[in-house]
Regions:
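N-terminal beta-strand motif that seeds the catalytic metal site of vicinal oxygen chelate
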Residues: 1-17, 67-70, 125-129
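Core segments of cupin and vicinal oxygen chelate
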Residues: 10-54
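Vicinal oxygen chelate
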Residues: 16, 70-116, 124-127
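Short acidic/glycine-enriched loop/turn segments that link adjacent beta-strands
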Residues: 38-43, 64-66, 100-105
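Conserved beta-strand in the GNAT
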Residues: 55-58, 108, 118
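Helix-adjacent hinge/juxtasegments
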Residues: 57-60, 64-68, 73
Length: 129
């Protein structure tokens, strides 16, 4: 498995609107899916850091960490082989999820310190033989 990019970071925030004001105001980041979130059509809004990186703002009371999980883009691969290898403690997946570049296939794993890491690949990255 090879990591290609950093896709997104999910922050647990107490007040989503206040966080949107901070990231879109003084930091000048582009809001994403805000109206869909306000209409109850999407579970959270995001802000775009770069064409391939976003920060998701997840409304939650503060827990032990303000970071819910990080997401790394990997080269397209067979998730079942990854799961069967026993290399990772798999928490969830494979599942289809939305990210910085659209829909992707993801597996959630736990790192040695208990942090959740989402590993994902995008269908558009598959190279046909």
């Amino acid at each position: 498995m090879r990591v290609k990019d950093f896709d997104h970071l999910v922050l647990n925030v107490r007040d989503v609107e206040r966080s949107l004001e901070f990231y879109c105001g003084p930091l000048g980041l582009e809001p994403i899916r805000v109206e869909e979130w306000r209409a109850g059509e999407f579970p959270f809004p995001s802000v775009r850091v770069s064409p391939s990186m976003i920060i998701d703002l997840l409304g939650r009371p503060r827990s032990e960490s303000n970071v819910d999980h990080i997401c790394l883009v990997v080269e397209p691969l067979d998730w079942q082989q990854v799961i069967d290898s026993g290399t990772f403690t798999v928490l969830e997946g494979p599942v289809g999820r939305s990210g910085a570049r659209g829909e992707a296939q993801s597996v959630y794993v736990r790192d040695p310190d208990g942090n959740t890491v989402e590993l994902r690949w995008y269908p558009q990255d598959v190279v046909e033989d």
